[in-house]
A protein has these predicted regions:
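Polar, glycine-rich mid-to-C-terminal structural blocks
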Residues: 1-35
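Solvent-exposed alpha-helices and their adjacent loops that cap or buttress functional pockets
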Residues: 19-20, 47-49
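Small/polar/charged residue-enriched interaction surfaces, especially the RNA/DNA-contacting tracks
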Residues: 42-46
Length: 258
């Protein structure tokens, strides 16, 4: 999304917040124009290209106040789930994407998604400088999905359907102490390298790089969903799988299990 498109989203957040409507989930379709100064054309307008993007803004609380649900703020992972659900509904599996950490003028911290080496989206925390300029004090999470690029990569996609799995999923978590330059994409790839048959998904649900950690280290809290299509998993199978995951992380990522 271009600067004007981002500004409109932040203006809407500022306006709503001033009227005590602070729990927001907004989206907008818009055109983005790119100038390529490396090319020389007889007609200067040909140096410009146009693509369609979706902007997503999330801020405030996850749920409206009620007696059944504990009041919690939205987080980066709220946005991540929304973006990945869009990809999934369009047939783009996140395990087939290259996912890298990013930090730039827009995002103080975030993730970039590429599918077949094509950039399809960026999500993250809106930079504090941008929020300050927009008179916004709350955390804002922003996603820029490249709709034109997404349509191109899925144009040959054929929908397939499989029966719902009969047997229950099992979740296991690991806390990994790793070097700061180790990316989540590496953690995910190593997991599927170690276990292809029953590992369904890998997700990061907490990152910590503050006090009480060795210099140059960070802590990832990672969840793993395991499921067998033919039978219910037993403790022995689960423990064997988790042991393989731990071994590959220690051996190939230099991780310590916390």
């Amino acid at each position: 999304m271009n600067r004007r498109g981002r500004s409109r989203g932040l203006e809407a957040i500022n306006r709503n917040t001033n009227f005590r409507n602070a729990d927001l989930r907004l989206y907008e379709f818009g055109n983005v124009y790119h100038f390529d100064g490396s090319k020389t054309h007889e007609h200067p307008v040909k140096n410009y290209s146009e693509s369609e993007h979706i902007g997503i803004w999330i801020t405030g609380k996850k749920e409206t106040e009620n007696w059944k649900v504990k009041e919690e703020p939205t987080t980066f992972f709220t946005l991540k789930a929304n973006a990945e659900n869009i990809f999934s509904r369009l047939g783009i599996k996140t395990e087939s994407c290259t996912i890298e950490s990013i930090s730039n003028d827009i995002f103080s911290e975030g993730l970039e998604y590429r599918f077949n080496n094509v950039l399809i989206g960026q999500i993250g925390y809106v930079n504090n400088k941008i929020l300050k300029n927009g008179n916004i004090s709350a955390d804002v999470f922003y996603g820029d999905l490249c709709w034109t690029a997404i349509l191109k990569v899925i144009k040959n996609h054929k929908a397939t359907y499989t029966p719902l799995r009969k047997y229950p999923e099992v979740r296991r978590d690991l806390a990994l102490l790793i070097d700061k330059d180790v990316q989540f994409s590496t953690i995910k790839a190593l997991a599927f390298k170690a276990e292809r048959q029953i590992l369904r998904s890998v997700n990061i649900f907490d990152v910590y790089d503050g006090a009480n950690l060795p210099e140059g280290k960070k802590s990832y809290a990672v969840s793993f969903i395991l499921q067998d299509e033919e039978k219910t998993l037993n403790d022995k199978q689960i423990e064997k799988t988790m042991s393989r995951l731990i071994s590959v992380y220690e051996r190939e990522a230099g991780a310590q299990i916390r």
